[in-house]
Amino acid sequence: EKVTVNYGEVLDYKHETIDKLVSGVEQLLKANGVTMLKGTGTLLADRQVKVTFAEPAEDGATESYYDAEHIILAGGSYPAKLPVEGMELEGVLTSDGLFALKEIPESLTIIGGGVIGVEFAEVFSALGCKVTILEALPKLLANLDKEISQNLKMILKKRGVDIHTGASLAKIEKDPAGGLICHYTEKDKDQSISSQYVLCAVGRKPNAAGLFLDPEEFADIAENSAALTTKHLEAAAQTAHDLGITMERGFIETDIYGQTGAPGIYAIGD
């Protein structure tokens, strides 16, 4: 009865768990004879990779070059944001930023009713946060069976989550009283909701462009993939094309074996 959560300890446990997992993987790599370098890799011609070190090496070197018969590109992904006014405001978060908060939000509006959005809705509503989901499509978890979607919607509503489907976000603005206001359209009616924070959970984008961009020339994305612009994508696509690799909307095209258009160069990941 009246159970509360020490959110600080929850975050400490999360960080400790992540650190243990990362350390464990690093030890496995080392035990299997894998050399690990910390830095930014850039693919060059003739199956060569330039590595710009995160910190200078013991000899003072800031970069090095490596040649290989086979190269695997695994750039991962980063949280996407909608091209909507107000997305840049303080308090509008992605999944990366939400768990960086030091305390449980009093209220949270989640843009997106996909897997990521629903997961965070369940977690933060259980922690005592007032959660609202705005989903543009007619139902939650649009890629899943209708029955699953309906059951999850009922479960979330019983837990106090407000759900608005068919809700198209128009803009986000600062609330004079504090927090943020999301303006959206639902059933042809203009609506708005205020909350302490807004989570943009509309999927993820491929993080491949940086593999083809010189980190010194495009320093703004070396530490922040979300800073990618059309200019970056076009430059990356052109460089990739020159290497025999095709990119489409940031994705690297491969054949059924995961090989790109350049012999010996493969791409993996989601």
Model-derived regions: residue spans:
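FAD-site-proximal beta/loop scaffold in flavoenzymes
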Residues: 88-104, 197-270
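Rossmann-like dinucleotide-binding cores of NAD(P)H-dependent redox enzymes
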Residues: 11, 16-22, 26, 99-100, ...
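A structural signal for the hydrophobic beta-strands that form the central parallel beta-sheet
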Residues: 36, 73, 94, 163-165, ...
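Feature captures the FAD/FMN-dependent oxidoreductase FAD-binding
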Residues: 5-70, 163, 170-181
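Core beta-strand elements of the Rossmann-like FAD/NAD(P) dinucleotide-binding domain
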Residues: 58-70, 188-197, 261
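Short glycine-rich anion-binding loops that position phosphate/pyrophosphate groups of nucleotides
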Residues: 42, 77-79, 203-206
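Dinucleotide-binding/catalytic capping subdomain of oxidoreductase cores
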Residues: 2-34, 133, 152, 159-163, ...
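Glycine/Thr-rich phosphate-binding loops of Rossmann-like dinucleotide-binding domains
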Residues: 39, 81-83, 119, 124, ...
